[in-house]
Amino acid sequence: MDPETVNAKADELLKKIVTEDMAPEAKVKASYSYVRSHYTYSGHSDKTDWVQGAYVMMESGQGDCFNYYAVTQLLLDRCGIPNIDVRKVRNYPDDSDHYWSLVSVDGGNTYYHLDTTPRVGDGDDFCLVTDAVLDAYSDANKGCHNRDKSLYPATPEA
């Protein structure tokens, strides 16, 4: 899938959920809310190309954590929001992958976690959360957000 087609599709979607005068934080929250409420989770996907993953999600309306991450990254990129992709470190050989983002609402000075993948039964909201919040959730849920912290900027403490 060529990036121009995917970008055009994202731009059309963004016209419905953000405005030019919105602050970066509001754009992040609007994108988060849209992705969480307009797509459904399916079990697996091809994880070789995030642009293709975003396109598949926008076309089919469903995907796994990689597709959620990919469509979110696409929307953030099109809004000019600095973001960094994060990949979970596997806790054991057959552990699953997981993908989410670190996002900055101040032009790249500080970052917060953003994970649009829905959670079954717990309703946790991972929109602009700190390392402490995400780590507490991860520790209580079998290391679901373990990551090599040396690869990513630390979030503010509060």
Name each model feature, range by range:
Residues D2-M57:
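Secondary-structure boundary elements
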Residues P3, D21, Q62-C65, C127:
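Flexible, glycine- and charge-enriched loops at secondary-structure boundaries
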Residues P24-S31, G61-L76:
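Active-site nucleophilic cysteine motif
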Residues H38, S42-S45, E59, S96, ...:
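Repeated polar recognition positions within modular binding domains
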Residues S42-Y55, Q62, G80-D95:
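Catalytic cysteine-centered active-site loop
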Residues G53-V56, S60, N109-D115:
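Short, well-ordered strand-loop elements centered on a beta-strand within folded domains, enriched
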Residues N67-D135:
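Hydrophobic/aromatic-rich core segments of domains that either
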Residues G123-A158:
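Low-complexity, Gly/Ser/Thr/Pro-rich intrinsically disordered linker/tail segments
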